[in-house]
Amino acid sequence: MGRFSSLCALTAVIHSFGRVSAAIGPVTDLTISNADVSPDGFTRAAVLANGVFPGPLITGNKGDNFQINVIDNLSNETMLKSTSIHWHGFFQKGTNWADGAAFVNQCPIATGNSFLYDFTATDQAGTFWYHSHLSTQYCDGLRGPMVVYDPSDPHADLYDVDDETTIITLSDWYHTAASLGAAFPIGSDSTLINGLGRFAGGDSTDLAVITVEQGKRYRMRLLSLSCDPNYVFSIDGHNMTIIEADAVNHEPLTVDSIQIYAGQRYSFVLTADQDIDNYFIRALPSAGTTSFDGGINSAILRYSGASEVDPTTTETTSVLPLDEANLVPLDSPAAPGDPNIGGVDYALNLDFNFDGTNFFINDVSFVSPTVPVLLQILSGTTSAADLLPSGSLFALPSNSTIEISFPITATNAPGAPHPFHLHGHTFSIVRTAGSTDTNFVNPVRRDVVNTGTAGDNVTIRFTTDNPGPWFLHCHIDFHLEAGFAIVFSEDTADVSNTTTPSTAWEDLCPTYNALDSSDL
């Protein structure tokens, strides 16, 4: 325990300067607790992993077995005392029980207890993240970066540096606990980059600093840990060459700005080819205070040898903004199925709606079951109608091509664009936001899709090769809380043959169900 405590202390010190902490993993403890933090100069209670925000960087190599023991020491009932952690982007083949979505894949971990997540990064590498998947708890702080390195990275010759110093996290930060604030906040109080930021009208607190050496090439890993807004990200005076989207390698694509939605990740190569100086890093949110006055929504790119002062660089108009449709997967780029809309084994159209309080998909608002879907399946329930109320769960056949469409009208999806995340898979986006064109030859492939605005009909495809119940939901956490989700039960009959939960997993529900309401 002494070595672990020392690591936590070191992590806290490093985070105070807006740098990503020393990496932990793939075998590690992750202690979840409450503490007061002031990342933008305003002090509030938060939910933290290992005592820091964002949570510590967890790393491993392609093929590694991750064993992460989550210890729940939460005591503040306003932000929930229970927790459940989702390892965003991992397929969890054969370990659906470790996916972490509360009441879909497990019961929450009760305060005073621990739970070991044990899964393997089989054939996966890239940029991931982890966060609470219980109510809106991650908005209160429980979110952090995760990287799986590939010793045989096909893009390795494009960069010189790829380590904890090249992680860039974007987070919306609220001065009020999620359960005490508005159901649908109109913007956050501040944007935090690597855990630091300023809020409008606040003090000029320290900004995060990312240091580079002139002449070197850096693989920057950009992660949106957002609960709500999307961001337009840029670095004054520098282009960015994207090589990865959501842990999928893509052909290099050079841009000067990236619009990134909640849950999405990008790797881009930044060449430090400018004068030795300080340059603003900018993350303009889609809601809230949408300016850079006084250094808000900003961080600093500092060349070694530059003065330790705020930059004086100015924002310029983007001339090479990212168009998602221009991203081409490096390997096996073709979408599954036939090259026409509907040319799949199973096509599903998802109609959205909102009644002022709840979101609906095909006229149903998702309500978490009291018994997790996976537990129901393993207990012998296989009918979609028996697992969840009609319309909340769709049974998908095995080894089939699936097409999902998200038509958006002027009235059916307030708060658009909505970023939708599918657990257990990546998918090909055969029709992207802002376009009526289709691409079945080499469409972008990822695990979070911007479903666009009025007139869009974003369409994705994937293949059912991963038995289990998988969540599909809006990654604006306030919208998920309001029912904006469905569950796919994939190859339901084979789940019991491919998924063997741990004994500790089986104990989660009896322990959670025995809690007093004040300890939930």
Curated annotation (Swiss-Prot):
Q: Which cofactor does it need?
A: Cu cation
- Known function: Lignin degradation and detoxification of lignin-derived products.
Q: What is its EC number?
A: 1.10.3.2
Q: Which family does it belong to?
A: Belongs to the multicopper oxidase family.
Q: Where does Cu cation 1 bind?
A: H86, H421
What PANTHER family does UniProt report for this protein, alphabetically? LACCASE, MULTI-COPPER OXIDASE
Which biological process annotations from GO are given for this protein?
A: lignin catabolic process
Could you list this entry's UniProt keywords, alphabetically sorted. Copper, Disulfide bond, Glycoprotein, Lignin degradation, Metal-binding, Oxidoreductase, Repeat, Secreted, Signal
Which superkingdom heads the taxonomic lineage of this protein's source? Answer: Eukaryota
CC annotations in GO: extracellular region
Q: Identify the residues that bind Cu cation 4.
A: H418, C474, H479
Provide the gene name from the record.
LCC4
Q: Which reaction does it catalyse?
A: 4 hydroquinone + O2 = 4 benzosemiquinone + 2 H2O
| Residues with glycosylation annotation | N73, N76, N239, N399, N497
Q: Which PROSITE patterns match?
A: MULTICOPPER_OXIDASE1
* Disulfide pattern: C107-C509, C139-C227
Details of cofactor binding: Binds 4 Cu cations per monomer.
Name-wise, this protein is: Laccase-4
Localization per record: Secreted
Q: Which GO terms describe its molecular function?
A: copper ion binding; hydroquinone:oxygen oxidoreductase activity
Q: Report residues binding Cu cation 2.
A: H88, H131, H475
Domain named Plastocyanin-like: residues: 24-149, 161-303, 370-491
Signal sequence, renumbered to the chain: 1-22
Residue positions binding Cu cation 3: H133, H423, H473
Q: What is its main location?
A: secreted
